[in-house]
C-alpha cells in the first residue's frame, strides 16, 4: 500500500472524477455561505434555472457586514442591508439553514461551524472566504473559493481542484510564558515568508501542536492562508474527539463510534512523502507583533523595527521601506514606544471563549488609557453567552472596553467598525494590509 499524507488521504477519498492531467472533481461535504460572496452565485443559479444540489450540506450566516452595536440589518449601510436581505431571500427560496442577526447562535462562520459540530475530521469544506483554512484544525480539507466556484458547489456539490504539494511544518520546543498560538504562527510566517506556502497544503505537527487546544489549533490553521498556502491541516486526536462530542451536528450513538474509527485513520502515514519539511523551535520565542503591511513583517515585542537598508533583497527592501512610510514608523525604533488609537479583540482568528478568557485575565483590575477606544467582539452568540456567564463582559467593560454583538467587525472594513485615516490599532485579526481595517488605517 502506498504511504499517504493526511491531505492525500482526504483528497483521494473525495474524488468523483479524475482527469488525465492530474486534476480532479472533488465531492464537497460542507458548503458555508455568508452575505458578501453569495448573492451573485444565487442569481446565476436562477438565470440558469438550477437548484441547490444539497441544501442540507449548505449552511449560511451573516457576519461580514453586520453591526456589532445593534441588531438591525440597516445599521451598516444600504449595500450591507441589501446583501443581508438577499441572503435571507436566497436561503428561504433554496431551503438553506441560516443564522441571521436575530438568531442567538449568529456569528462568524468560522466560529459557528466548529462550535456546532458541523466541521468534522476528514471533510472537504469550502466557503467564499479566504480564512476557511480555519477548519483544517479538525483534520478537514478546508479552503476559500471565489463566487463562480460558490455557484458551482451550490449546483453540483462538487468542485474541480488540482492536487497541491505537501508541506510539513513541525513546531517543537517548550512554550515560553505569555506566548500564544497567534505568536507561534506569526513567528512561523515571519521566518518563512508570506509566499512560502504557495502551491502547498501545509500540515502542522510537533509536540507544540499536539498539546494545543482546539481553539489554539484553529488560530494556527486560520493563518495558514497568510503564508499563501491553499489550506492548513492538523491531524485529529483525542482532544478533537472530546471537543466534538455531543455537539448539535456531531454524529451520535452508533454513528459516533463509526466516525471515531474513521477519524483515527486520519493521519499521515509514517513513510509518507512531503515535498518540503520544516522544523521550527519556539523555545526562545517572545510575544510577536507586526510592524508592516503584511503578516511576515513581524518582530518580537522587545525587538526594534528592522533597518530596511540592511535588507539584501531589493524587493524586500522596497516593501519594508514602503511599509514604514505607510505605517508612519522609523527603522530601529521600538513599537512599545508608539501610541495606539484603537484596540480590537475579535475576528475569525481570536474571538473564541479561550481568547476572551486570556484577554480578560490580563485586563482584570486594570484600566486602558483614556484616549484609546477598545472593543471586544465575540465570535458568536454562544461565545458571548459563555463569556457573560463567566463575568468576562464585566471585566472588559470595567477596564474601558466596549462589549459588542457578534460579527467580523474590525477584521475588515466592510461595516461601521473601522479605523479612520491615520489611526493605529492593535488588533487580534489576521491581516495588516494597507486599508484592511479602513482607508489609511494602520494595523498591528
Swiss-Prot record:
Keyword Iron tagged: yes
Annotated EC: 4.2.1.33
Segments of this protein annotated with the region Disordered: 423-444
Cofactor note: Binds 1 [4Fe-4S] cluster per subunit.
Gene Ontology terms for molecular function: 3-isopropylmalate dehydratase activity; 4 iron, 4 sulfur cluster binding; metal ion binding
InterPro entries documented for this protein: 3-IsopropMal_deHydase_lsu, Acnase/IPM_dHydase_lsu_aba_1/3, Acoase/IPM_deHydtase_lsu_aba, Aconitase_4Fe-4S_dom, IPM_dehydratase_rel_enz, IPMI_cat
EC class (word): lyase
Coiled-coil segments: none
Protein residues bound to [4Fe-4S] cluster: 348, 408, 411
SUPFAM superfamilies per record: Aconitase iron-sulfur domain (SSF53732)
Pfam families referenced in this protein's UniProt entry, alphabetically: Aconitase
Pathway the protein contributes to: Amino-acid biosynthesis; L-leucine biosynthesis; L-leucine from 3-methyl-2-oxobutanoate: step 2/4
Cofactor requirements of the protein: [4Fe-4S] cluster
Catalyzed reactions per annotation: (2R,3S)-3-isopropylmalate = (2S)-2-isopropylmalate
GO biological process: L-leucine biosynthetic process
Keywords attached to this entry: 4Fe-4S, Amino-acid biosynthesis, Branched-chain amino acid biosynthesis, Iron, Iron-sulfur, Leucine biosynthesis, Lyase, Metal-binding, Plasmid
Family according to the record: Belongs to the aconitase/IPM isomerase family. LeuC type 1 subfamily.
Summary of subunit composition and partner proteins: Heterodimer of LeuC and LeuD.
Biological role stated in the UniProt entry: Catalyzes the isomerization between 2-isopropylmalate and 3-isopropylmalate, via the formation of 2-isopropylmaleate.
Protein name: 3-isopropylmalate dehydratase large subunit
Gene: leuC
Amino acid at each position: 500500500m502506498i504511504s499517504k499524507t493526511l491531505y492525500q488521504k482526504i483528497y483521494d477519498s473525495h474524488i468523483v472524477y479524475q482527469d488525465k492531467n492530474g486534476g480532479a472533481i472533488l465531492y464537497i461535504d460542507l458548503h458555508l455561505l455568508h452575505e458578501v460572496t453569495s448573492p451573485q452565485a444565487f442569481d446565476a443559479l436562477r438565470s440558469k434555472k438550477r437548484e441547490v444540489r444539497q441544501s442540507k450540506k449548505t449552511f449560511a450566516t451573516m457576519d461580514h457586514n453586520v453591526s456589532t452595536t445593534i441588531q438591525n440589518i440597516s445599521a451598516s449601510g444600504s449595500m450591507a442591508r441589501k446583501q443581508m436581505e438577499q441572503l435571507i431571500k436566497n436561503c428561504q427560496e433554496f431551503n438553506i439553514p441560516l443564522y441571521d442577526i436575530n438568531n442567538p447562535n449568529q456569528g462568524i462562520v468560522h466560529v459557528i461551524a466548529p462550535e456546532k459540530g458541523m466541521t468534522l475530521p476528514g471533510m472537504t469544506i469550502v466557503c467564499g472566504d479566504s480564512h476557511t483554512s480555519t477548519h483544517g484544525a479538525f483534520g478537514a480539507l478546508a479552503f476559500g473559493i471565489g463566487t463562480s466556484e460558490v455557484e458551482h458547489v451550490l449546483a453540483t456539490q462538487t468542485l474541480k481542484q488540482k492536487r497541491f504539494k505537501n508541506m510539513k511544518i513541525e513546531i517543537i520546543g517548550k512554550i515560553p510564558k505569555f506566548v500564544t498560538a497567534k505568536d507561534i504562527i506569526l513567528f512561523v510566517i515571519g521566518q518563512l515568508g508570506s509566499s512560502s506556502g504557495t502551491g502547498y497544503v501545509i500540515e502542522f505537527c510537533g509536540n507544540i501542536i499536539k498539546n494545543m487546544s482546539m481553539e489554539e489549533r484553529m488560530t494556527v490553521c486560520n493563518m495558514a492562508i497568510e503564508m499563501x498556502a491553499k489550506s492548513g491541516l492538523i491531524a485529529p486526536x483525542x482532544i478533537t474527539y472530546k471537543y466534538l462530542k455531543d455537539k448539535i451536528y456531531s454524529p451520535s450513538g452508533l454513528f459516533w463510534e463509526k466516525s471515531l474509527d474513521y477519524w483515527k485513520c486520519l493521519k499521515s502515514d509514517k513513510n509518507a512523502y512531503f515535498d518540503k519539511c520544516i522544523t521550527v523551535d519556539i523555545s526562545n520565542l517572545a510575544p510577536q507583533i507586526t510592524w508592516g503591511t503584511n503578516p511576515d513583517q513581524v518582530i518580537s515585542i522587545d525587538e526594534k523595527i528592522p533597518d530596511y537598508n540592511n535588507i539584501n533583497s531589493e524587493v524586500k527592501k522596497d516593501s519594508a521601506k514602503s511599509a514604514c512610510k505607510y505605517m508612519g514608523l522609523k527603522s530601529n525604533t521600538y513599537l512599545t514606544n508608539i501610541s495606539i488609537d484603537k484596540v480590537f479583540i475579535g475576528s475569525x482568528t481570536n474571538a473564541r471563549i479561550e481568547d476572551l478568557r486570556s484577554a480578560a485575565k490580563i485586563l482584570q483590575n486594570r484600566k486602558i488609557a483614556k484616549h484609546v477606544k477598545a472593543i471586544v467582539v465575540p465570535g458568536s452568540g454562544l461565545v458571548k453567552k459563555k463569556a457573560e456567564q463567566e463575568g468576562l463582559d464585566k471585566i472588559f467593560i470595567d477596564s474601558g472596553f466596549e462589549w459588542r454583538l457578534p460579527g467580523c467587525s474590525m477584521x475588515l472594513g466592510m461595516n461601521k467598525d473601522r479605523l479612520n485615516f491615520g489611526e493605529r490599532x492593535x488588533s487580534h485579526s489576521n491581516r495588516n494590509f494597507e486599508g484592511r481595517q479602513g482607508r489609511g488605517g494602520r494595523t498591528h
